[in-house]
Amino acid sequence: MKRVVILGGGTGGAIVANQMVRQLHQEVDAGEVELTVISNVEQHVYQPSFLYVAFDLAIPADAKRPERQVLDRRIHLVEGEADRVDPGQHQVIMSDGMELPYDFLVIATGSRPVPEDIEGLVEGGHHFYTEEGALKLRDALQSFKGGRVVLVVGVPHKCPVAPLEFILMLHEWLDGRGLSSATHIVYTYPIGRLHSLQGVAEWVGPVFEARGIECRTFFNPEIIDPVARTVTSLEGETLSYDLLVGVPPHLGHDVIARSGLGDSGNWVPTDRHSLLMQGRDDVYVLGDATNLPISKAGSTAHFQADVVAANIVNRLRGGYGSLRYDGKVFCFIETGLNEATYVTFDYERPPAPVASGSLLHLYKLAFNRMYWLSTAGIL
């Protein structure tokens, strides 16, 4: 029997597992191939929903389903914490000592926000990257009566356009509550332009200007003083705030560090086209877990899962697994509460947002609902 273990049951892990079981249904049903997903959570979460939770446009329950329900019944689900990966012995060791051998391993451990890495952010600010954070931000917005709103961005972080979406949704949300004239919004970004993607930066500049949103670049948040309500950057600039919203920096999963497989951020060195872990021909990496200099987004994991699933299936059947990932990413961008745009790009083509509109916003909402078909490997 050939064994494929998928470490991580998030977007990338679920998609790659469900795609493989569909493509290998004969081998799986015959007991020739076994697929196992390791998940350290019981609930599968559609994390982009938390942005809508912050504006009271969704509830957390809309974003969650049991992990067992997300996976095909023929996929073995191991719920628990993986202690480490041992590539030399071709196995994953669980925290309870269970050993899971593999012929192929897919690392899809994702990323996690670490707001504590910015001094004072936990005590003095808010974010929307977890259920708890989104609910606290929702409460803060509901009681907000005006003042200075400052958004700061830590790097790296998942969903590259989320800071822009929050600011543009906030602007329209404040206008709808009659608070626009009483509020000053300040958008900061850690590099010398408004976004890491040049095309997105060029697009959003005039959009922010038309809405009267102040922008500060080269602003890397270092210290937040919750009492004085100030945030000071690594560059030495200090801004005052009445409401501070942060995009927390992210790290890879601790199992990567315990296994000695990653860099200082727990990102796994990965070939940009084959998605094989560098130095191994039996370990694939996808989604946020890679060290690739591309957007950490759900669509990235999806497009990579297509390649990884097809290549593992091909190799299990005696082929070479020669499909290549081209760096494709697709992101909707909410430009308010009722309009959106999108960008698509890859290693060769830079992003260029199209004109925003209400129809694209409806597409975005439809995509949110169809996410569960995506994880099932149907879309």
Q: What residues fall within each predicted segment?
A:
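Beta1-alpha1 glycine-rich phosphate/pyrophosphate-binding loop at the start
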Residues: 1-76, 156-198
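FAD-binding core/adjacent interface of flavoenzyme oxidoreductases
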Residues: 3, 75-165, 172-176, 245
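Glycine-rich, N-terminal phosphate-binding loop of Rossmann-like dinucleotide-binding domains
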Residues: 9, 96, 109-110, 235, ...
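Internal hydrophobic alpha-helix adjacent to the cofactor/substrate pocket in enzyme cavities
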Residues: 17, 172, 301-327
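A Rossmann-like FAD-binding core segment of flavoenzymes
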Residues: 32-36, 75-92, 100, 174-270
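FAD-site-proximal beta/loop scaffold in flavoenzymes
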Residues: 121-145, 238-306, 310, 314
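Flavin (FAD/FMN) cofactor-binding core of flavoprotein oxidoreductases
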Residues: 194, 227, 324-341
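C-terminal auxiliary extensions adjacent to catalytic cores
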Residues: 339-379
